[in-house]
Amino acid sequence: MPLNKNTGLSDDEEQYLKNIGFRIQYLRKQRGLSQNELAEKANLSYTTISHIESTAPYGISIIALFKIAKALDVDPYKILMFE
């Protein structure tokens, strides 16, 4: 499978990261939180939240995933798995 020259990721990997960003954005909005509010609750920077949600394939660290899940009061599994 060819890799993107800029990211080093396959199309499937890029799409998975985009889906994670979409899922976090959906859960955040469902709870009525702004990106700034989620960043504060998760003890992360606004830029980190913005990058994750922007669908740009920056990736997400395991620690950031757990902090965001805790701030959103969901199991990290709910962010990683799509129905």
Task: Please give the residue ranges for each predicted region.
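Short, basic-rich loop-to-helix N-cap that marks the start of a DNA-contacting helix
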Residues: A56-K70
